[in-house]
């Protein structure tokens, strides 16, 4: 790996240099941002929307699946700890492909081994791209038309899933529309941004980003009967993960190392997952660049090689301990946008971008441990996941179109997006090169 910069730039958040990483600790290198922390305590439980995938496709009981998600959520903290200025998430658009892959194996240890093989390969691809620094070259060398096509494929994939036969839009249409509509309004409406300057309530709603859209979706869902009434489990306060059961029933130590044939079968999908996740690096680069332009009091260092390494570590650790079908991605687009928009409001709103993102994910980890919070918000897991996905679709569509400057870019990106969303990377690459 090339020599890593160790000199801190002017106005850059303090850190401890550690190879390619920049170690930062809460309360020492950055302050906890209260707004993001409160959002994380409430919105963080949406991480448990992954529980149904672990139950349905890996055959895990609810309590064990919850324990696996706690470990996955803890690993979110690696990004802020190691100097990656993002709110990390899943590689969500690959989930339908992962499910199809898993269904090719019988339920039980064999299917869990298949998930281990896939996630381990995904982690190794991320790490390879980070160690060789090919990620930096890849991000800057890929033509704008291809970047646009990759990003525009996300809304096609997301909306196809949400509007499909088993999509959540058929289960919770009014709740989702209410939540997504409000989130888009407070994020992109020029009129709303003008009115919030003179209206304290509108300003409060906007400052808390995703919080009010989720709460509105919950209220609407309850009123129209799309959601069950929330319960409040009183008694034990903190969920202790079932570490022994995880090691015995889910980890590579319990189910065994996957055979070579599984790795061979998983390799094409692992490469597809990376190509799709690549769009998150493009999105992050754009969002960080916009944040830099909005403020000159802090230098924000986004390095795609570092981001690859951290994402790779998360996937590699999970593949060994608690394989995770949504996979570990470099970005939760919706929340990263929400935090960066508040950051742009100035130092009084948020001192540090990384501090805001770290505060959210620290609270996320705490929220999935607090049993009363999890039990209360459990009915909205599916709706919250859909709001996040659909907002991501809007953001990716905006940024993808921004990359298309010429008519040729627009033609290539449009066709590539459609082919990538429906047929995969091989066909999409052929169209891009044609």
Residue ranges, per PLM feature:
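Helix-coil boundary and interhelical linker segments in multi-pass alpha-helical membrane proteins
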Residues: 52-66, 101-114, 164-167, 263
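Helix-loop-helix hairpins and the membrane-proximal interhelical loops
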Residues: 1-62, 198-302
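Helix-loop-helix junctions within the multi-pass membrane cores of secondary transporters/permeases
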Residues: 17-32, 39-51, 79-151, 297-393
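Membrane-embedded alpha-helical modules
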Residues: 111-227, 355-434
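Membrane-interfacial loop-to-helix junctions in multi-pass transporters
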Residues: 62-70, 146-148, 260-264, 299-309, ...
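Loop-to-helix transition at the N-terminal end of transmembrane alpha-helices
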Residues: 58-81
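Hydrophobic alpha-helical segments of integral membrane proteins
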Residues: 134-142, 159, 163-166, 236-260, ...
């Amino acid at each position: 790996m090339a020599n890593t910069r160790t000199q801190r730039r002017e106005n850059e958040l303090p850190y401890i240099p550690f190879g390619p990483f920049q170690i930062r600790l809460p309360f020492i290198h950055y302050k906890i941002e209260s707004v993001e922390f409160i959002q994380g305590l409430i919105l963080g439980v949406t991480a448990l929307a992954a529980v149904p995938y672990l139950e349905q496709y890996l055959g895990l009981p609810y309590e064990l699946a919850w324990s696996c998600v706690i470990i996955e959520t803890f690993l979110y903290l690696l990004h802020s700890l190691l100097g990656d200025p993002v709110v990390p998430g899943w590689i969500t658009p690959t989930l339908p492909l992962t499910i199809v892959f898993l269904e090719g194996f019988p339920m039980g240890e064999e299917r869990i081994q298949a998930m281990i093989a896939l996630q381990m390969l995904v982690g190794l691809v991320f790490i390879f791209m980070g160690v060789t620094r090919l990620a930096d070259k890849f991000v800057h060398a890929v033509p704008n038309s291809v970047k646009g096509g990759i990003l525009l494929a996300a809304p096609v994939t997301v909306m196809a899933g949400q509007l499909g036969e088993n999509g959540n839009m058929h289960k919770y249409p009014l709740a989702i529309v209410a939540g997504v509509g409000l989130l888009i309004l407070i994020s992109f409406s020029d009129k709303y941004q003008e009115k919030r300057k003179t209206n304290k309530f509108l300003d409060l709603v906007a400052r808390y980003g995703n919080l009010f859209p989720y709460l509105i979706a919950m209220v609407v869902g309850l009123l129209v009967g799309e959601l069950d009434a929330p319960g409040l489990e009183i008694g034990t306060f903190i969920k202790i993960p079932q570490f022994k059961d995880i090691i015995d029933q889910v980890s590579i130590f319990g189910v065994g190392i996957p055979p070579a044939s599984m790795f061979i079968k998983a390799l094409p999908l692992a490469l597809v997952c990376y190509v799709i996740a690549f769009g998150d690096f493009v999105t992050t680069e754009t969002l960080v660049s916009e944040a830099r332009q909005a403020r000159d009091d802090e230098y924000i260092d986004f390095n795609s090689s570092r981001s690859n390494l951290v994402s790779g570590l998360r996937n590699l650790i999970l593949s060994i301990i608690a394989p995770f079908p949504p996979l570990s991605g470099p970005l939760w687009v919706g929340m990263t946008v929400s935090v960066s928009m508040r950051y742009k409001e100035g130092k009084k709103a948020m001192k540090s971008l990384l501090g805001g993102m770290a505060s959210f994910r620290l609270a996320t980890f705490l929220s999935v441990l607090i049993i009363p919070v999890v039990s209360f918000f459990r009915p909205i897991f599916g709706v919250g996941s859909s709001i996040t996905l659909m907002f991501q679709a809007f953001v990716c569509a905006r940024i993808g179109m921004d990359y298309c400057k010429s008519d040729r870019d627009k033609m290539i990106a449009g066709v590539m997006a459609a082919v990538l969303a429906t047929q995969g990377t091989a066909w999409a690459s052929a169209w891009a090169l044609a």
